[in-house]
Structures are given as C-alpha cells and as structure tokens.
Amino acid sequence: MIEQNKHQQLRIGLASPEQICAWSEKILPNGEIVGQVTKPYTLHYETNKPERDGSFCERIFGPIKSRVCACGNSPGIGNEKIDSKFCTQCGVEFVDSRIRRYQMGYIKLACPVVHVWYLKRLPSYIANLLAKTRKELEGPVYCDLFLARPIAKKPTLLRSRGTFNYEIQSWKDIIPHYLSARPHYLFARGSGTFKEREIATGGDAIGEQLTGLDLQMIIDRSHMEWKNLVELKWNRLEENQESTVDRWEDEKIRRRKDFLVGRIKLAKHFLRTNIEPKWMVLCLLPVLPPEPRPIVQLGEGGLITSSDLNELYRRVINRNNTLTNLLARSGSESFVICQKKLIQEAVDALLDNGICGQPMRDSHDRPYKSFSDVIEGKEGRFRENLLGKRVDYSGRSVIVVGPFLSLYQCGLPSEIAIELFQAFVIRSLIGRHIAPNLRAAKSMIRDKGPIVWEVLQEVMQGHPVLLNRAPTLHKLGIQAFQPILVEGRAIRLHPSVCGGFNADFDGDQMAVHVPLSLEARAEARLLMFSETNLLSPAIGDPISIPTQDMLLGLYISTVENSQGIYGNRYHPYHSEKKSFSCKKPSFYSYDDVLRAYRQKRIDLYSPLWLRWGELDLRIITSVNQEAPIEVQYESLGTFHEIHEHYRIRKGRMGEILNIYIRTTVGRTRFNREMEEAIQGFACFEHPKKSLPALRI
C-alpha cells in the first residue's frame, strides 16, 4: 500500500524478476511461500468463493472479509486456532480485506515472453538497442524464424549466425540420423540438446541478445558513427553537390543520425536508471490485485459480470500450463513451438489487445479490454481516478473579456473569491478583533457585510491566483494573476493572454487555484505572472499580442475623414448628415478634448485642432516644408498658416507663436494612453531620471 507520508513520487518503469517476486511473494506464519498463481479458475461455481491457487485466491491476495479466513473462522472463534494471525486449515492470514487492493501475484511463465510495449510501440526500444527493424524481430518473437547461435570450442552442427527457417519435418529425420553416427552427442536427449544449445526462438532468442548487450560500447560506437556522418555531411557541403542522388544520400544520413541519437539517449537512460535491457523479456508475469479486476454479481442470484482482465489472465494460465505439460512429457517439437507462440499472443492481448492485428474477442464479438485500455485515455485509471481530482481552494467558471484589466490582472467574481479566500478572511477578522471567534467570523461572512468585502480586498492584494485551462499542453497553460473583485459569476480575463491558454470567449471555462504556502506564492509572483511570460516557449515569438477585436476597435476609434481638411461642410460620419460650422474647435490639452467629449459637445470622429506642446515640426512634417494651403491674417498683424495636418500661428516678424495639429477625439485618446504607457515604462526602467513628456 502506498502511504502518503512515506511516498512523495511515483515512477513507472521496468521491473526485474526479483522485484516482481518481492511484490508478489509472502511467507506465511508456517513458513510456506505463496504468491504464484497456477490455476486459471476464479470463483467456485457453487459457493462463489475464490479457488485455491487461482487468480482470486485468498491465500495469495488476502481474505475477502476482514480477519475472516476462507473457512469462515476469525481469530476469536474456533478451537483449532493455533496462531491468531493465521488459519492452519486454509492458510489464509487474519488481516484487513483492504490488502486485496494492493497485494499482487505472479505467473511463472514456461517460456520467456517479449513485452509487447517495447517491441510494437513507436519507437521500438528493443529494435533500437539491437539495431534491427521491427519486422526482423517479429519473426523470432512469434516463432516464425529461429536464431542460430554456434558455440565456440564446442562441437556444433550449424556454421551460420543470424535467423533462418527451421522446418520441423525436414529436421526431424536428419538430426537423429546425424546424431546416431556421433556417439559424443548421445549424452543427452539427441536432438533436444542440439535445439537447446544451437537454436533459439521466441523470447529466448530476444532475451539472449539483450543479455549480451554492452550499453557503454553501444554509446561509444554510436557516437563515433555519428561523428563520421557529420564529417561526411560537411564534406558534401564543401563539394557543393546538389544532384538527386546526393539528396537521397543526405536524407539517409539524416535518418541514420536521428536513429543514432535516439539509441544513445536510450542506452544512457538504461545506465542512469540501473535498468537491465533483458527485463524487457518477461519470465514472471505480474498478476494485478483482485480489486482492480472485480467480479460483480448483479442482484441476488443474478448474472455475474467479470472484468475482461480475468478472462485474459485465464487464457495466459491455460496456455502456460499446457506448455509446462508438453515440456514435462517431452512433447512434439511442433506442438511446443506452437504453444510458445500462443503464450506470446496471450500475453500480448493481456498487455495491449489489438496491437498485433485482430484483437481477441468475447462471445459477443466485443474486443477484450486489456491492461493498456484500462490505464490509457480520458476514462483510464490515471486521468479518471488519479488525475483531475477535486482539490481544496479551487473553483471553476466561464471566462469573459475584461477590457479594463491590466495584463497581469484577472477579474474574480465576488461569489468565488469569498469562498476561496474564506480562511484568510476569517484569520484577518479575528486578528483585527472584528470578530471574537470562528463562529462569529463565519456568520459575518454569510451576512456579507461591507466590512467583509473590505477585508477580502485587502487579503487579495498580496495573494496571486493561478488560472488553468485544460488541456495544459505547455507551461503557459497555467499562469498567475493578481485577482480583482468583479460583479457577476464569470472570470474576466485580458484578451492578450488568451494566446498562451489557447482560449477564446465562446464559452471556455477556466479553473482558479489559490497557492497557499509562501514558496508557492513567491513562485507564482516571480515566475508565473502573465506579464513575465510574453514569449512562446516553443519558438520564442511573442504570444501575448493584440487580438483581432482589439485591432478592429483601435481602427474604429482612430479612423478619420478620408478627405481630411478638404472635406465638405457635412460631417461624413454623422448619421443624420447635419451641417456644422466649418470652423473646427480648438483645444489646449488632452483633458480639454476629453472633457468636451464627455459633455457631448463633440463626438468620437469630430475633427479638431489640438495645441502641440513642442515647437519642433520635424516630428510631424517631412524634411521639405510643404506650402500652406491657406493663410489667414488677423487685425493685429498675426497670421495663421493652414497646412493639411497642422496649423501654425506666427507673429508680425514671422516667429512661431504656437502650433495646433489636426486630429480627432479617438486619436487623442489613443495617443494619451500610449504616452502614459511609455512614460510609465520609462520611469520603471530609469526611476532616478526625470524624462520629458513624450508625444506620439
């Protein structure tokens, strides 16, 4: 059983036969070792009790009822009780029935079996280590081809290495006739010695090749070959050969380099984790505890349903027992080879049904659900039962756009915020002596008085929250934000951060989590804030960019009459085409423009003259000064030069008195926002310098 206080991580990997025995075997108080499943039976058809040494045996996996043995006795009942921990009649220990959730068993295979995950899956680790293709390995694995292995300094029949077709009928007559003329072969069972010493097939053939691997030598040789390929590639580049043949050769070199890199990584992983490659060939097959593969009766006397894993285990045990009997009786070689192939197929179906072609099916033509089907997918053990569980201090709601938010802020509904931060609010209320005890603080929170919202806002100021949108495919799928209380029930989000979440505002939901510890809050503040994650982790391009809605809004707010100063006396964007004075209003500052807009004296697209604070025209005109369109003289001798985009007022001597630029309310507002943003960034970068006002 996994105890929370002792285990802090879970690693999935290959297990050695010794480790499988340690998981499965246990020593009873009488010294008997149990753990091996030898019978294909599950429950007795009359008593519905587990069969002895079967896949539900109580001696192996523990009692069905806590502290009650298979005989029905308990430690306090019965005169034949010798030990309070053990029943001498049935051999069942008096322990808690929860042991059946984690106590495993094992099947001792009569022949080694290759683990199909490491053979058929991509990439094929066995094929990678042995530097062969999967098709070359499938022949020996499924007993279609045989591996010749001449032994040095010993009498041998075969002089070849590698795989070959072993025809049973042709060799059955040749080998005994050959051995009868050579009495030094007759110390054993004739052709049996030849087959055991010089021919291998099935899991034996693959296991022997994996056992003889030197991982460090594989790394060194692969690295040397990779360097040679790199030098060959550079030589081709220097020769500037671009023919079709050379392109094919370059592609072959690239594929070979990728293969070598993968092989080096795999060998280094085996060395780093102290895993032996031969463990990819199974000699002992673990049997899952009974709880993950239950047998359930539907009602009293009703139909009994069983997990598909039980049927797949039954097939493995039946075929394994058949092969054991054949080997014990020295059965026909063709039968033995055929049975080895059947065991390999049965184990393949148990681990991953259908990976080798047509899956095994039940009487209703439904494919059996294998171990891979149980653990993979959205409804598998990991995602359904282990991941995605409900956690404390978390919530979930629909996201909507928050145009008033900064990039690092998110709008948190008050209903969600008061639940997430309730513990912090209670502590603050009691610490400030606003509430005398816990009950009074909870009562104040239920009443939702004004003081509660004030305390909540103070608590949220220094406490970031994490927003997560499933599926979390990269690190930007979960980011930290500073929460802001908002009305309603939807989480408000800045539109520019949607790129990292791959989210939009068409009904997407997000989960919100509250980091509790000081370390988690510091990590969220320093590493996970949205304003510090502006670049894509995959390609490095900006990922927090203006959305299409923002760009369209900016375009609409800053659009002006295409005719400019030459427009007619009717405003082109006015809905009723009302006439207005040709004399455009003049304003001294941004505030005057926005004040007039709020008072509805002008609209968003009204052309106006705004006084320009700088007398340097280089930032609004070209190098060559354009001629004025119109010159207006005043009675005191001053005059106005009207240009297309600006107006200059000059004195009698030609000196510049002031400058007005032609713009609109929308452009004025946009320019002010940009100026404040740049000014704030400049002050943040150079806090000790007084920067002049920026004009855009």
From Swiss-Prot:
| Enzyme type, top EC level | transferase
EC identifiers of the protein: 2.7.7.6
Q: Name one GO biological process term.
A: DNA-templated transcription
Give the family per the record: Belongs to the RNA polymerase beta' chain family. RpoC1 subfamily.
Record-listed Mg(2+) binding positions: D504, D506, D508
Q: Does the keyword Metal-binding apply?
A: yes
**Cofactor(s) this protein cannot do without:** Mg(2+); Zn(2+)
What's the protein name? DNA-directed RNA polymerase subunit beta'
The record's cofactor note says: Binds 1 Mg(2+) ion per subunit.
Complex and partners: In plastids the minimal PEP RNA polymerase catalytic core is composed of four subunits: alpha, beta, beta', and beta''. When a (nuclear-encoded) sigma factor is associated with the core the holoenzyme is formed, which can initiate transcription.
Q: Sorted alphabetically, which Pfam families does this protein's record hold?
A: RNA_pol_Rpb1_1, RNA_pol_Rpb1_2, RNA_pol_Rpb1_3
Q: Which domain of life is it from?
A: Eukaryota
Gene symbol here is rpoC1
Residues annotated to bind Zn(2+):
C69, C71, C87, C90
What is known about what this protein does? DNA-dependent RNA polymerase catalyzes the transcription of DNA into RNA using the four ribonucleoside triphosphates as substrates.
